[in-house]
Amino acid sequence: MAKTIRLTTAQALVKFLNAQYLHADGKEEPFVEGIFTIFGHGNVLGIGQALEQDAGRLNVWQGKNEQGMAHAAMAFSKQMLRKKIYAVTTSVGPGAANLVAAAGTALANNIPVLLLPADTFATRQPDPVLQQFEQEYSQAVTTNDALKPVSRYWDRITRPEQLMSSLIRAFEVMTDPGKAGPATICIAQDVEGEAYEYPEEFFRKRIHYLERRKPTEREIEEALERIRRSKRPLLVVGGGAKYSEAKEELVALSEQCGIPLVETQAGKATVAADFANNLGGLGVTGTLAANKAAREADLVIGVGTRYTDFATSSKTAFDFEHTTFLNINVSRMQTYKLDAYQVVADAKETLSLLISRLKTYRSAFGDRIAALKEEWLAERNRLKSVVFNRKTFVPEVKEHFSQEKLNEYADALGTELPQTTALLAINETIDEDSTIICSSGSLPGDLQRLWHANEPNTYHLEYGYSCMGYEISGALGIKLAEPEREVYSIVGDGSFLMLHSELITAIQYNKKINILLFDNAGFGCISNLQMDHGGGSYYCEFLTADNQVMNIDYAKVAEGYGAKTYRANTVEQLKAALKDAKKQETSTLIEMKVLPKTMTDGYESWWNVGVAEVAASQSIQDAYQARQAKLKEAKHY
């Protein structure tokens, strides 16, 4: 007869979380670092009681917004290269609903996080309970069903014994590099407190092995043949290469064979920006060097990439008539993209084998790599020194705003600071081992093109879901992952307004984060999109009822929370603020008023977005025709 221990469902959950370990590359560590909580009537008497009684080694943090704390949990796991996670517990109803955006963010980025929303009563005795809606077609539907499409694994616990098989399945999913993502386990609030005789063996130390899948001999031989046949192969470094920690292998293969590297947002900072063959970001937000190399390549070797529309310029980045693809990925689904030859294997293992068998191969790119890189560095230097003037200023995003309108913004915001000038001043000033985080707006494009990250894993971009509000919440997660490093949240005013609640959590627990707030008084990148496609400037600027530019004192907002704040509208003020902020022990916010339309623009790239087929505006009709013409150049699938 197996020995048992009588625990509530919630107590069993906490005990199980404490017993999970991950073994990767010879190193074994606890997999669950802790749990973020916002308690409500659905979880405070269940999971809340269990944690209060015995949290074990789990760190417990009080969040301020469910989406925010789930984003912090996701960022922690992403920064830890998916080798550790946080769990997140919420109440029923609205609290659970707030997890949907965060779950989508984790799913789009293939990041494991354990979501534990409370659910309505399994017995249904008090139905409808507080924060429960009613549907006529089913009593089994709750808010938590909205989490199904955005979870890699989803389950509902209505009996205590169901917890055992559900948790084992959830951790199998979260520790598999090929399908990692959010696991959601919804626990009925009455069941959280129900007791059960759980087998003691369920709580024994459980080790999940992160094995590096090796390619088959057939996969390697075919990959070698395709590389040897090609004259101008190109390596696309995706997020999977970063999680595989394949830096040395990428550099070695590139150097040995003369193959240029380009990066996706997720793959950036796998290889140092200063590496001679690294041509930078690819696609819509990419560099001119990378986009030119992509057009010239006859073989594209995708290493751990999903080939999103931003990376492929909506499938126009490559010469599809003459270019073939070789995809290396632990996800079989991802290897099938763009009609590629598929290698379903770990990036590091595969690249190592390729290096050992390509001793004599050299690409035909030759000196072209250095020429492309030099050309782009000259452009980067120009963007570092942009200076505004009130008579003949030409912004990077041209023909949208008149000189008069730009002058009005300069007066209203009290600034003449261009966005690219400010960003590159930051890049030059902060420590190289600092980590930056960004997610949405125009800043991800500027960062992918311009930011030089030379230390591994110091560039943390969430550009799978591009979720506004991730930046500040995520900075807290990064700080929990790397407490000794400075972390900088690079965020626009639009995203700051969407969500910044976890700044309070960072201050509360003395987890210092630095917020670099670029305020251009509006949703700048969407204004660009709107006007690039024939529209006017329509509800993307932050204007008062009498059409005046809003000048919001964001520094005062952060000061009210307890952060150390700065206002910097010149490069000199910015550098001084950055140096002083580093000395602080509490969280900081540097507010920069920057001029609109001074972010970088596209470099020989295209983004397919929906344009009205019928419109009164001739400029919109022209934009529609231009889109139709461009689609003829694109791969259709």
From Swiss-Prot:
One Pfam family matching this protein: TPP_enzyme_N
Q: What is its EC number?
A: 3.7.1.22
This protein's pathway reads: Polyol metabolism; myo-inositol degradation into acetyl-CoA; acetyl-CoA from myo-inositol: step 3/7
> Its Gene Ontology biological processes?
inositol catabolic process; isoleucine biosynthetic process; L-valine biosynthetic process
Give the cofactor note: Binds 1 Mg(2+) ion per subunit.
SUPFAM superfamilies on file: DHS-like NAD/FAD-binding domain, Thiamin diphosphate-binding fold (THDP-binding)
Listed InterPro entries: DHS-like_NAD/FAD-binding_dom (IPR029035), Myo_inos_IolD (IPR030817), THcHDO_hydrolase_firmi (IPR023757), THDP-binding (IPR029061), Thiamin_PyroP_enz_cen_dom (IPR012000), Thiamin_PyroP_enz_TPP-bd_dom (IPR012001), TPP-bd_CS (IPR000399), TPP_enz (IPR045229)
Residue numbers binding Mg(2+): D493, N520
GO cellular component entries: acetolactate synthase complex
**Which intervals of the chain are annotated as region Thiamine pyrophosphate binding?**
442-522
**GO MF term set:** 3D-(3,5/4)-trihydroxycyclohexane-1,2-dione hydrolase activity; acetolactate synthase activity; flavin adenine dinucleotide binding; magnesium ion binding; thiamine pyrophosphate binding
Keywords attached to this Swiss-Prot or TrEMBL record, sorted alphabetically, are: Hydrolase, Magnesium, Metal-binding, NAD, Thiamine pyrophosphate
Q: Which reaction does it catalyse?
A: 3D-3,5/4-trihydroxycyclohexane-1,2-dione + H2O = 5-deoxy-D-glucuronate + H(+)
User: What does the record give as cofactor?
Assistant: Mg(2+); thiamine diphosphate
Top enzyme category: hydrolase
Query: Which positions does UniProt annotate for thiamine diphosphate binding?
Result: E66
Q: What does this protein do?
A: Involved in the cleavage of the C1-C2 bond of 3D-(3,5/4)-trihydroxycyclohexane-1,2-dione (THcHDO) to yield 5-deoxy-glucuronate (5DG).
The UniProt similarity line reads: Belongs to the TPP enzyme family.
Xref: NCBIfam families: myo_inos_iolD (TIGR04377)
Q: What is this protein called?
A: 3D-(3,5/4)-trihydroxycyclohexane-1,2-dione hydrolase
Q: Which species is the source of this protein?
A: Shouchella clausii (strain KSM-K16)
